[in-house]
């Protein structure tokens, strides 16, 4: 695993440098990352339906899909979607041992969505990078593509319920990144690079999107200040 020494110039991109350091970047930048990822994987396995498709919207390097497939095996099929060519290349290599069970597909979710029905959909730190005006349509598509009883596992960076809470969450989040070895300069460079690219919304707004799409049950399964994860079940 390459160490994250990425120094972004201009707007943030999921380029080859980011792809190489991505696992280290997540482990050091996402609070309780291992806990969140394990919970997401466990829920995907728990709710997977026999002989259905599992779709990862924003699969990055494909690691989580491979973890799920290592348990479910050929009882299911696996589709990873991303828009970054370096990420797609890494995901194809990661998922190659699955052979025909897995596909990695280049799609821009702003204008193109997978037509296949599925049993489980993952969206892990993906919607936050998509302009807000497209998000409800994407969540609606995921709901409509799920089989009855199927689930969406949604993980997002979020805003606090008010400005004071957001400011407190961000301050403590940056303190965590310092503890994980990032410098103040690296934190500031990444913050500026992500402005207007990563656009979080409140937890309540995310939950409203899930309910408005028609999900019968929605619950939060993980939260750390300005990060949250939900399981949404189709009725």
Residues of each region from the PLM?
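A short glycine-rich, Lys/Arg-flanked "PGG" loop and its adjoining helix->strand segment in the class I
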Residues: 136-148
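Short alpha-helix
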Residues: 197-213
């Amino acid at each position: 695993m390459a160490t994250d020494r990425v120094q972004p110039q201009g707007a943030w991109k999921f380029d080859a440098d980011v792809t190489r350091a991505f696992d280290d970047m997540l482990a050091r930048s996402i609070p309780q990352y291992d806990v969140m990822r394990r919970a997401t994987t466990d829920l995907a396995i728990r709710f997977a339906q026999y002989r259905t498709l599992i779709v990862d919207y924003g699969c990055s390097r494909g690691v989580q899909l491979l973890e799920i497939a290592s348990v479910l095996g050929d009882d299911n099929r696996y589709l990873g979607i991303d828009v970054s060519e370096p990420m797609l290349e890494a995901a194809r290599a990661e998922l190659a041992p699955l052979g025909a069970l897995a596909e990695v597909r280049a799609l821009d979710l702003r204008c193109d969505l997978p037509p296949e029905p599925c049993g489980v959909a993952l969206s892990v730190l993906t919607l936050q990078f998509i302009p807000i005006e497209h998000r409800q349509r994407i969540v609606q598509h995921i709901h409509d593509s799920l089989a009855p009883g199927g689930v969406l596992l949604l993980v997002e960076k979020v805003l606090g319920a008010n400005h004071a809470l957001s400011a407190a969450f961000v301050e403590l989040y940056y303190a965590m990144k310092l503890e994980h070895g990032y410098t103040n300069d690296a934190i500031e460079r990444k913050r500026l690079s992500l402005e207007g690219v990563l656009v979080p919304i409140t937890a309540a707004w995310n939950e409203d999107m899930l309910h408005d799409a028609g999900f019968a049950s929605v619950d939060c399964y993980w939260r750390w200040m300005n990060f949250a994860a939900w399981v949404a079940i189709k009725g």
